[in-house]
Amino acid sequence: MTTVIAVDLGGTNLRAALVGSDATILAHTAVPTPTAGLSGAVITAAIIARVEALLALPEGREVTAIGVASAGPLDPGRGWVTNSPNIAFPVVEITGPIGDRFGLPVSLINDARAGVLGERWAGAARGSDNVVYITLSTGIGGGAVVNGRLLLGMDGNAGDIGHIPVDTHYNLVCGCGFAGHWEAYASAKNIPQFFAAWRKAADVRRVAFDAGSPRAIFGAARTEDPVALAFMEVLGEVNARGVSAVIVAYDPEIIVLDGPLARYYGDIVIRYMEPRIDRYLPLPRITVSSLAGRSPLLGAAAYALDRAAGGPGI
């Protein structure tokens, strides 16, 4: 069985795995993504350390390629991550130093684009030719397969759906520097700031829970706290606007939600989002990933396997 190493570089965690050509994860390792240092070289070094650990395992002897999925934007020509709002350094060099270190082909793909490949290979979208994958994590990202082909765009950044404009009322600023983007409202990083802006605008004076984290806000909604439920109505509208734009753009038969917010609170997200989409558009099937956060890893592996075999990576 052909084996590759897959890496998932996120804003919070750095994961790596040995993955077989049958989508089996043979070994897995994870560390926090480095945020301190003089340059992105500290992240490159952390990836190299994870790869070295996996290659030292008995299963690592047959590795033929390395696939890296990362939060974007990406510069695929140089093999860099560049100016990502969710990574601490403006440039992280990936393919050059890692390829030089191990003498293996290294491919780089956006983590959400990898996610849709992972879902289509081994998850909820297996066998589907028109799929959108949406990750609700530190940021919001997406990937789309249309008529069986992965959409990458000119620079591999097609599907940066977190930057869909969804609001002009609160005018919250996104990590990219512009205002009104979906990610500025509904990502795990930014939900607390949206709650604070909504609370002020709605003149909500008493809150019986700590609104400083999405976990606390969604947890209060699960216990039917009236303030949290009122906020879910507003958040559901924002999510519906983002997903409606995705449906119109890609015409998917299935949308797979992933990321911590979807995995832990997907029932709440869908409950407050779906009715607001259904007013305007036919609903595709919307479901939560069953791959326990490993869709980008599996997608990075699928991409690396195809590239190593001479394919386009899809």
Question: How does the language model describe each region?
Answer:
Residues 128-185:
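Glycine-rich phosphate-binding loop of actin/hexokinase-like ATP-binding domains
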Residues 26, 82, 151-152:
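Generic structural signal for well-ordered beta-strand positions
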Residues 1-65, 75-78, 96, 100-106, ...:
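ATP-binding/phosphotransfer module of carbohydrate and carboxylate kinases, centering on a glycine-rich
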Residues 32-35, 89, 158-160, 166:
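A short acidic/small-residue loop/turn micro-motif
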Residues 29-31, 85, 154:
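Short hydrophobic alpha-helix segments
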